[in-house]
Swiss-Prot record:
Transmembrane segments: none
Catalysis performed (reactions): Thiol-dependent hydrolysis of ester, thioester, amide, peptide and isopeptide bonds formed by the C-terminal Gly of ubiquitin (a 76-residue protein attached to proteins as an intracellular targeting signal)
Active site: 149, 152, 268
Biased composition annotated in UniProt, kind: Basic and acidic residues: 1-10, 99-110
Protein name: OTU domain-containing protein 6A
Residue numbers spanned by region Cys-loop: 146-152
Biological process annotations from GO: protein K11-linked deubiquitination; protein K27-linked deubiquitination; protein K29-linked deubiquitination; protein K33-linked deubiquitination; proteolysis
Gene: OTUD6A
Region annotation (His-loop) ranges: 258-268
Region feature (Disordered): 1-20, 84-110
Function: Deubiquitinating enzyme that hydrolyzes 'Lys-27'-, 'Lys-29'- and 'Lys-33'-linked polyubiquitin chains. Also able to hydrolyze 'Lys-11'-linked ubiquitin chains.
Length: 288
């Protein structure tokens, strides 16, 4: 078995290759969509932002699993070494000049596209926030910001509980419930790279990572938390109907806000708070 440093180098090389492949895919997509087609251009920008966010999150989570005692300097040295290893053989002056010009043109086009994407994403963010403010306002609520640290879903849940419980405990209870109810959750999991269904061992590793890492939580984790708290959970979205999880429970629901464009790393959960003090209450959840 490889030592941790060798394993880290292998992961970094793969991440570099995957980023290059993604950028090539993005360039191909850009060339396939006319700049005059605003509808398709908007969808392209959404798809690009999603793909980049998913890859960034995937790479971050993979590196968390293989962190060792190496300093940041050693990682930089590894990256520099990889660049040297991947450097092409010397070529003619004319060939190098042509390559440099082509590289500069690609960088210029990429810069234009990134600026365009940033502008559009800022517009998507404003539009999303306005829609959510209207939906929440109709219910006498407003959004409450939660840090984007990988724990956002659990922190948003924690924010609405009347008892003291740590994010770590919520993660532990989520993973424990999922492990005890494998048949309820396992069919919905697959490998994001191969699309192969998870086996039992894969699922157990996934549950362990809920506890050990800052892995982002989603709908299945919310389902588990709904059972743990014996409480319905509502997820308000700008462009989709409100998702209700745990409808079989009768307590006052926990309400989360799901955002697609709030942060560059992708999806995010926020909490809510009443617009006015003294809002009507209900039977509040407790950790069982």
């Amino acid at each position: 078995m490889d030592d941790p440093k060798s394993e880290q180098q292998r992961i970094l090389r793969r991440h570099q290759r995957e980023r290059q492949e993604l950028q090539a895919q993005i360039r191909s997509l850009k060339n396939s969509v006319p700049k005059t087609d605003k509808t398709k251009r908007k969808q392209l920008l959404q798809d690009v932002a999603r793909m980049e966010a998913e890859m960034a999150q995937k790479h971050r989570q993979e590196l968390e699993k293989f962190q060792d005692d190496s300093s940041i300097e050693s990682v930089v040295e590894d990256l520099a070494k990889m660049n040297l290893e991947n450097r092409p053989p010397r070529s003619s002056k004319a060939h190098r000049k042509r390559e440099r010009m082509e590289s500069e043109e690609r960088e210029r086009q990429e810069s234009i596209f990134q600026a365009e994407m940033s502008e559009h994403l800022a517009g998507f963010k404003r539009e999303e926030e306005e829609k959510l403010a209207a939906i929440l306002g109709a219910r006498g609520l407003e959004m409450k910001a939660i840090p984007a640290d990988g724990h956002c879903m659990y922190r948003a849940i924690q924010d609405q509980l009347v008892f003291s419980v740590s994010v770590e405990m919520l993660r532990c209870r989520t993973a424990s419930y999922m492990k005890k109810h494998v048949d309820e959750f396992l069919p919905f999991f697959s490998n994001p790279e191969t699309s192969d269904s998870f086996g039992y061992d894969d699922f157990m590793i996934y549950c362990d990572n809920i506890v050990r890492t800052t892995a982002w939580g989603g709908q299945l984790e919310l389902r588990a938390l709904s059972h743990v708290l014996k409480t319905p959970i509502e997820v308000i979205q700008a462009d989709s109907p409100t998702l209700i999880i745990g409808e079989e429970y009768v307590k006052k629901p926990i309400i989360l806000v799901y955002l697609r464009y709030a942060y560059s790393l992708g999806e995010h959960y926020n909490s809510v708070t009443p617009l006015e003090a003294g809002a009507a209450g209900g039977v509040l959840p407790r950790l069982l």
